Curated annotation (Swiss-Prot):
It holds the Pfam family Iml2-TPR_39. SMART domains: TPR. InterPro entries: Iml2/TPR_39, TPR-like_helical_dom_sf, TPR_rpt. One of its GO terms (cellular component) is centrosome. It comes from Homo sapiens. Keywords: Repeat, TPR repeat. The lineage of its organism: Eukaryota, Metazoa, Chordata, Craniata, Vertebrata. TPR repeats lie at residues 315-348, 505-538, 546-579. The keyword Cell inner membrane does not apply. Belongs to the TTC39 family. This is Tetratricopeptide repeat protein 39A. It comes from the Eukaryota.
Length: 613
């Protein structure tokens, strides 16, 4: 056992941690504080001098770059963050015990005791695992963007405008990401080591042999961040992917993941704010767009409140405040929050585009097509994430204008729709799902006498689960229903064409959603069922069938008809393949299935309890 004060003093019971570790953590907390007050460059400048020597400085520096990449989804930002995170990982490796936690704790022979790790070594383990986890997260950025994120003025080059690297650079990036994604699914060694290390560290924290050191809150916060992130992410994956991962040793428990992140968020540690951000992303994006729309909004507000009080002008927290108002259906309040977010900082200028994307949808919910068009136009001119998507949205909004409305800039929706396919970003043979959807919908405009899409803006609103937003406000729902009903009447009066059945079924789906939220349950069910009845007549929009089954199942679940709902969900999952936005639909089916099964189990337990009494 080492002597107190010696550099090899044992952790956690054998001696005093090195003061440099405590000092480094304090400095990194200061840097995060600068970051959260929109002083992005200052935070990086504060950290940079020690990034080559301190693993926490290096990790924090790389984490801020990764946050930038997550906000911008720009390939250059992703590469920059990835390279810096790799350097941080190498630095952590130098501070790790020669026999790592994963190797040591997993070995059945000559297993070292806990006391053989110094505090620096045990912190190096959690930092190393975090580097691996964050590098894995970067692999998801290109394909999972929510559509509003773009490249801001780069931290390292304030004059940099929105630009994307040339083709080869994009291809190399995508290939790198694709390989990392495959390695993640197949149990690639880096992600697997991160997962295993977090599992062992979690066991360590709960062990009766474990003694808390001076910097224990920061260490424990790191463990909770990693364990929570892994469990929560894995638990959300569709069953077919989850089975592959379980086969190679991964598993995820949603409740345990949420608990770990909530405990991490409530502590006072270097990782507390990261736990908060992950939870806010989960509550305001993942469960909303990829789930059933049932969001624990009270928990999101509880998480956000102390940070919004502490950082009233913090752009990140103002953005989440806007998202919460959107989900609550308070559209005017959401608009004010997003506008306030744009005013709060100018350094990451194009971070505003995240707000523009949200503002575009806010005005869509209100049926204010000119304002929606305005933000789609801004995005199409300033944003390099997906020109095809933004031009499609411009065309979609123009097509919603009335005959008497003046169309700005002399734009014509037919020409805009025709331009969409040429703007596709094809990277290593792959396209963004939203772009694929927009391109498929635009194809009908290539004929000399094109047949217009009935309500393209309202269709895309469904793709982003916007009906769960307007459903909170009957007035908004009535307004959208009126537009859909008029479109339905026009289809009935118009001549039959090759798109007639597809368009009629689309209108039925959207109408059913409005009726559901207005409490007209029977009418909603009839509309959803009519789509399945026309399944064999649909020529192009095959995504309508599984989504109609999904929406019908959700409607039945609200009536406690969970067994019927589960059968419909199983049919939607098993019987339909290769349709638009399939992965997103599968995520929603998975969330609905888990919810229905949970309700059935709770009902069974209640019956047993009643009988026992």
């Amino acid at each position: 056992m080492g002597q107190k004060g010696h550099k090899d003093s044992l952790y956690p019971c054998g001696g005093t941690p090195e003061s440099s570790l405590h000092e480094a953590l304090d400095q990194c907390m200061t840097a995060l504080d600068l970051f959260l007050t929109n002083q992005f460059s200052e935070a990086l400048s504060y950290l940079k001098p020690r990034t080559k020597e301190s693993m926490y400085h290096s990790l924090t520096y790389a984490t801020i770059l990764e946050m930038q990449a997550m906000m911008t989804f720009d390939p250059q930002d992703i590469l920059l963050a990835g390279n810096m995170m790799k350097e941080a990982q190498m630095l952590c490796q130098r501070h790790r015990r020669k026999s790592s936690v994963t190797d040591s704790f997993s070995s059945l022979v000559n297993r070292p005791t806990l006391g053989q790790f110094t505090e620096e070594e045990i912190h190096a383990e959690v930092c190393y695992a975090e580097c691996l986890l964050q590098r894995a997260a970067l692999t998801f950025l290109q394909g999972s963007s929510h559509g509003g994120a773009v490249r801001p003025r780069a931290l390292h080059d304030p004059s940099h405008a929105c630009s994307c690297p040339p083709g080869p650079g994009r291809q190399h990036l995508f290939l790198l990401q694709d390989e990392n994604m495959v390695s993640f699914i197949k149990g690639g060694i880096k992600v697997r080591n991160s997962y295993q290390t977090y599992k062992e560290l979690d066991s360590l924290v709960q062990s009766s042999q474990y003694c808390k050191g001076e910097n224990h809150p920061h260490f424990e916060g790191g463990v909770k961040l990693g364990v929570g992130a892994f469990n929560l992410t894995l638990s959300m994956l569709p069953t077919r992917i989850l089975r592959l991962l379980e086969f190679v040793g991964f598993s995820g428990n949603k409740d345990y993941g949420l608990l770990q992140l909530e405990e991490g968020a409530s502590g006072h540690s270097f990782r507390s704010v990261l736990c908060v951000m992950l939870l806010l992303c989960y509550h305001t994006f993942l469960t909303f767009v990829l789930g059933t729309g049932n969001v624990n909004i009270e928990e999101a507000e509880k998480l956000l409140k102390p940070y919004l009080n502490r950082y009233p002008k913090g752009a990140i927290f103002l953005f989440f405040a806007g998202r919460i108002e959107v989900i609550k259906g308070n559209i005017d309040a959401a608009i004010r929050r997003f506008e306030e977010c744009c005013e709060a900082q100018q350094h990451w200028k194009q971070f505003h585009h995240m707000c523009y994307w949200e503002l575009m949808w806010c005005f869509t919910y209100k049926g204010q097509w000119k304002m929606s068009y305005f933000y789609a136009d801004l995005l199409s001119k300033e944003n390099c994430w997906s020109k095809a998507t933004y031009i499609y949205m411009k065309a979609a909004y123009l097509s919603m204008f009335g005959k008497e409305d003046h169309k700005p800039f002399g734009d014509d929706e037919v020409e805009l729709f025709r331009a969409v396919p040429g703007l596709k970003l094809k990277i290593a043979g792959k396209s963004l799902p939203t772009e694929k959807f927009a391109i498929r919908k635009s194809r009908r405009y290539f004929s000399s006498n094109p047949i217009s899409l009935p309500v393209p803006a309202l269709e895309m609103m469904y793709i982003w689960n916007g009906y769960a937003v307007i459903g909170k406000q009957p007035k908004l729902t009535d307004g959208i229903l009126e537009i859909i009903t008029k479109a339905e009447e026009m289809l009935e009066k118009g001549p039959e064409n090759e798109y007639s059945v597809d368009d009629e079924c689309l209108v039925k789906l959207l109408k059913g959603l409005c009726l559901k939220y207005l409490g007209r349950v029977q009418e909603a069910e009839e509309n959803f069922r009519s789509i399945s009845a026309n399944e064999k007549k649909i020529k192009y929009d095959h995504y309508l069938i599984p989504n109609a089954l999904l929406e019908l199942a959700l409607l039945l679940m609200e009536q406690d008809r969970n067994e019927e709902a589960i059968k419909l969900l199983e049919s939607a999952k098993q019987n339909y393949k290769n349709y638009s936005m399939e992965s997103r639909t599968h995520f929603r089916i998975q969330a609905a299935t888990l919810q229905a099964k949970s309700s059935l189990e709770n009902s069974s337990r209640s019956m047993v309890s009643s009988v026992s009494l």
